[in-house]
Amino acid sequence: MKYYKKLLLFITVLAVFVLNTNFIFAKPNKKLKSPPAAPTSLTYTGIAQNEVTLNWQSVSGATGYKVYRATPSDSNYTLIATILTNSYKNTNLASNTKYWYFVRAYNSVGTSPDSSHINLTTAQSISTSKKLVMGFATYYYSGDNSSYNSIATNTSTIDEIATHTYITDSYGKISGLVPTNQITYANSNGVKTLAMVSNNFDGNIAKTLLENQTNRQTLISNILNAIKVNGYKGVNIDFEGLYYYDRSYLTAFMSELYSTLHPQGFYVTMAVAAKTSDSPTASWSGAYDYATLAKYSDQIVLMTYDEHYPGGTPGSIASISWVETVIKYALTVIPKEKLLLGTAAYGYDWSINGTKAYSISATYNLAANYGATIKWDSVSQSPYFTYSDASGISHTVWFENAQSLNYKLNLVNSYDISGIAIWRLGLENPDYWTSIKTKFNR
């Protein structure tokens, strides 16, 4: 018994000794007392049309790094990545575009100052195949020359026009002011002419029209007569605000229209609501069966604009990520050679008094008149500004311009779709056309 007590005492003393020894000789836990130093030697490699790789020296005591980007100037930076390594590959950039970057290191205590700021310009993307340019043309009143002047000025760059001419009623009767000058000039200068037919955004008109075969046939006969009489080369169907349950009837109408017009040598095209997936019961886009409609159309125009719209919350007209997602989905069901990307040439001014639309030039004038600074949102790749009017009412303005258009044209080239459709001719400015000519090598 005494033996076991002595053994137990020995083991206890030994354990205390070992624990004390480890405590005495163990390296103390270093507690961070300050944020890390700023990263150094920020450089870039592998620059291409739409990507670049950033590298910098590792920072002692840093847990990770935060990467910031701005375009086109050294201001208004956005955090684009939080990473653990000292290298970052930035993808989905626009070609031929200037970007600025800096990096910060961070740990549990805080964040470092900025690294040096660097800038670079991505490689230029030029289409290797001819891209088609369609322009929607309007003629709102006698003497309205806005679209005509744009057609005449940019004839060498425009391949097609779709004149916003006809509105149908519930029974297939069409009416509208025919832009004879636009049609005559375009036909004389090798620009294809299409007669646009709309339902005036009225789902009830479309419901009565599409759900009745007699009404559909009346409309088809009236369209055929109108394009023959006025010298059009085809038609563009722009039915919007449709009820999702009229999906099969819209498809039936396009099938009947195509089988009537196409054998006679007329083009059949249509504009469809933008969507990122097919949801047949979606309120705004459910009526459009992309896959089947493509069978009965020579061209499909994706209306990739009004992502934020009058009456809604302020925001980008067409953010680049949304536009790209729409294209990606469309390409799963529509042949790329039939696909046109809708591009906007306008802006919206939101306030508590409602929303107003402006041309690109008018938007710049609006900013100048109120001394507003135009800013750039690097997430949506869109310009915007805010101001207060004489009554003290706050306004938020988002618009499209040549710079934001560049990003869309890069997508057209990257995904090799057929081209673009501009809403609308007369709202754009010279820089807008310069972007088109440069990106499409026109």
Model region roles, listed by residue range:
Residues P28-G61, S95, S108-S127:
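Pro/Thr/Ser/Gly-rich low-complexity, intrinsically disordered linker/stalk tracts
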Residues S125-N222:
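Glycan-recognition patch characteristic of GH18 chitinases/ENGases
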Residues I161, I237, I300, L341, ...:
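Conserved, mostly hydrophobic/aromatic
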Residues Y171-K173, Y244-Y370:
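Substrate-binding surface in catalytic domains of secreted glycosidases
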Residues Y3-K27:
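Sec-dependent N-terminal signal peptides of Gram-positive bacterial secreted proteins and lipoproteins
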